[in-house]
């Protein structure tokens, strides 16, 4: 008996449900003959504690492997892997991060980022930029 060919999977990694809502339908239309699966990371892996340029590729790979294993897929079933991230100001110079003690949260303005903890944002941005730079050269 002839087996029907399975559709190839376009595995799209996003940070949260709002990203899936915003992009899922559009991506499904773009890859109309392919199965699009939008994987929600529930957070930003590029700033997750313990994630660095040396291990970020394997951390993302583990997410993909877990999905493949749970659905009995092999690497040949995947057509493409797309990781969509927002930069969150990762490449903004320190000079454009402003200490604002009255700010409850990060406030992105035309002149830069306003925060009540400049040092924390500078460190976060450095970690994120380093991880994003590593991911740029994958696949």
Where do the PLM segments sit?
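Acidic, divalent-metal-binding catalytic cores of TOPRIM
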Residues: 1-139
């Amino acid at each position: 008996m002839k087996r029907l060919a399975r559709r190839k999977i376009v595995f799209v990694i996003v940070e949260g449900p709002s990203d899936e809502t915003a992009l899922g339908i559009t991506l499904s239309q773009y890859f109309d003959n392919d199965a699009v699966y939008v994987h929600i990371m529930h957070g930003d892996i590029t700033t997750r504690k313990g994630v660095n340029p040396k291990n970020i590729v394997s951390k993302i790979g583990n997410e993909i492997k877990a999905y493949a294993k749970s659905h009995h897929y092999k690497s040949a079933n995947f057509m493409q892997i797309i990781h969509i991230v927002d930069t969150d100001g990762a490449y903004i110079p320190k000079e454009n991060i402003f200490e604002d003690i009255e700010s409850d949260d990060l406030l992105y303005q035309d002149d830069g980022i306003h925060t009540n903890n400049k040092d924390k944002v500078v460190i976060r941005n450095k970690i994120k930029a380093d991880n994003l730079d590593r991911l740029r050269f994958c696949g």
